[in-house]
Regions:
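A short beta-loop-alpha structural element at the N-terminal edge
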Residues: 10-24
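Conserved GNAT-fold acetyl-CoA-binding loop/helix
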Residues: 23-49
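Glycine-rich phosphate/pyrophosphate-binding loop shared by adenosine-nucleotide-utilizing enzymes
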Residues: 9, 66-70, 158
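Conserved catalytic-core motifs of GNAT/GCN5-like acyltransferases
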Residues: 72, 122-125, 137, 142-159, ...
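Conserved acetyl-CoA-binding loop-helix of GNAT-fold acetyltransferases
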Residues: 98-112, 134-138
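Acetyl-CoA-dependent GNAT
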Residues: 39-95, 106-107, 166-167
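Conserved beta-strand-loop-alpha-helix junction that forms the acyl-donor binding cleft
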Residues: 97, 123-133
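Conserved GNAT acetyl-CoA-binding A-motif
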Residues: 113-125
Length: 185
């Protein structure tokens, strides 16, 4: 799956070979912001392990051969009844903000998750983050609620806003989500 998004920019499925670049993009979010609630940045090997789920795709944006952002999906919760709901995340490299990479990544991730058969996508956004909220609103997510003061990092309590997007109608007997490699073109 490689889709040109615009001249010089492409979106593709992430591979384990991308783990170092993805970890490098994520590291400043972990070390200097409350956007991620992790307190220690994962090393390359840990990032590669996170990418291994056959049901939860990761995408990367490449500009002129350099990875400038990624979008990931993960189980919303581990209990089986949640398996039609998926959590999404997007991270863009420092210096690459404001150029549409987040929008392209999240749009393509939503397309893939929909094709897999997921019914609901959830984004958990640490507040304040008006840029992320605006992006999610533009892509059809709606506010579903806010957890107040649920994370303490960098000396501050942080609220988390939950955003939800329906990907498919809710049916009485939903089909199991498909592995992403079966539907990625």
């Amino acid at each position: 799956m490689y889709q040109p998004a615009r001249m010089g920019v492409g979106i593709r499925l992430a591979t384990e070979d991308d783990a170092a670049a993805v970890a490098a993009i994520y590291r400043p979010y972990v070390e200097t912001t409350r956007i991620s609630f992790e307190e220690s940045a994962p090393h390359d090997e840990e990032m590669a392990l996170r990418m291994q789920s056959p049901l939860h795709p990761w995408l990367v944006a490449e500009e002129d051969g350099r990875i400038v952002g990624y979008a990931s999906s993960s189980p919303y919760h581990r209990r089986p009844a949640y398996r039609w709901t998926v959590e999404t995340s997007i991270y863009v490299a420092q210096g690459a903000h404001g150029r549409g990479f987040g929008r392209i990544l999240l749009s393509r991730l939503i397309e893939l998750l929909t094709a897999q058969g997921y019914v609901t996508a959830i984004a958990a956004i640490a507040l304040p983050n008006p840029v992320s909220i605006m992006l999610h609103e533009k892509l059809g997510f709606v506010a579903a609620g806010t957890y107040r003061g649920v994370g303490f990092k960098l000396g501050e309590w942080t609220d988390v806003s939950l955003w939800q997007r329906d990907l498919a109608p809710r049916s009485a007997a939903p089909s199991e989500p498909l592995p992403f490699r079966e539907v990625a073109s």
